[in-house]
C-alpha cells in the first residue's frame, strides 16, 4: 500500500526549495506559502482540504523560521535547487536538495535535528554528493550543510575521507546484491525483527553453496 503523503512535510520542504531572496524574509516566506497552497495539490496527490490546514499551521511558524534562518542565509543563497547529479565512473547518482555557495551540498530535513551534529544517514548522503560534485568540478568538497527549517537550524559539517570511503563500500555491496551475491552479515545485524529475514536467510543459504 503506498505511503500517504504528509502535506505538512511536503509544504515545509517545498518552502525551503523555493527560498530565493535574503531581504524581507518573513514576507517572502509568506508569499511562497500562499503560492504553494495553490500549486502543491496540482503536483502531488494532496487534496486542498489537506494542504490548507498545513498552510495555516506553517503561517503561524513563519516569523520564528524567518528569525532563525536570517543568520544562515549567506550559507544557503544564491543556490540551485533540486540538482540532478550522475557519475558513470563512480556508479552514483542522486538529486541534491540544494547546491549552496561554494559547491556545498545541502540537505533539507523536515524532522528534528539530533542534539549534536547530524544523523548518520545524512552524513553518508552528503559524502555521496560530495563525491559527485568533486568529480564534476575536479576538486575536493569538504563541507556540507543540513537544513532543519522546523527548528530554524542550518548545520555545517565536515565531510571526511572515511565518509567517502564508506559510501563507496556501500555502493560495492549494492552491486553485489544486484549481481545475486549477498555480502556477509555483520555480527550485530538486527535480523530478528526484519521483515525480509526468511528470504534473506534462504538466499544466503543458496549463495553459500556457490561462493
Predicted regions and their residues:
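Cysteine-cluster motifs in flexible loop/terminal segments that predominantly coordinate metals
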Residues: 1, 179-211
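Metal-dependent nuclease catalytic cores that hydrolyze phosphodiester bonds in DNA/RNA
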Residues: 1-99, 206, 211
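Short helix-capping/linker segments at secondary-structure and domain boundaries
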Residues: 2-3, 134-140, 202-205
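Exposed alpha-helical structural elements
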Residues: 10-11, 166, 190
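Short edge beta-strand segments in beta-sheet-rich domains
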Residues: 41-44, 141, 189
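Mg2+/Mn2+-dependent nuclease catalytic core
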Residues: 74-172
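Short Cys/His-rich Zn2+-coordinating modules
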Residues: 171-179
Amino acid at each position: 500500500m503506498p505511503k500517504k503523503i504528509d502535506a505538512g512535510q511536503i509544504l515545509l520542504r517545498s518552502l525551503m526549495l523555493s527560498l530565493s531572496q535574503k531581504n524581507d524574509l518573513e514576507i517572502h516566506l509568506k508569499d511562497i506559502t500562499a503560492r504553494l497552497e495553490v500549486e502543491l495539490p496540482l503536483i502531488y496527490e494532496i487534496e486542498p482540504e489537506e494542504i490548507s490546514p498545513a498552510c495555516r499551521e506553517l503561517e503561524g511558524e513563519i516569523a520564528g523560521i524567518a528569525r532563525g534562518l536570517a543568520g544562515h542565509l549567506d550559507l544557503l543563497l544564491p543556490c540551485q535547487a533540486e540538482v540532478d547529479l550522475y557519475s558513470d565512473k563512480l556508479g552514483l547518482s542522486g538529486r541534491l536538495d540544494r547546491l549552496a555557495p561554494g559547491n556545498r551540498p545541502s540537505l533539507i530535513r523536515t524532522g528534528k535535528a539530533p542534539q549534536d551534529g547530524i544523523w548518520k544517514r545524512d552524513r553518508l548522503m552528503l559524502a555521496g554528493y560530495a563525491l559527485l560534485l568533486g568529480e564534476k568540478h575536479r576538486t575536493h568538497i569538504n563541507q556540507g550543510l543540513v537544513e532543519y527549517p522546523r527548528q530554524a537550524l542550518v548545520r555545517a559539517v565536515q565531510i571526511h575521507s572515511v565518509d567517502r570511503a564508506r559510501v563507496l563500500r556501500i555502493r560495492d555491496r549494492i552491486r553485489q546484491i544486484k549481481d545475486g551475491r549477498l555480502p556477509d552479515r555483520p555480527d550485530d545485524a538486527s535480523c530478528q525483527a526484519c521483515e525480509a529475514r526468511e528470504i534473506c536467510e534462504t538466499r544466503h543459504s543458496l549463495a553459500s553453496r556457490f561462493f
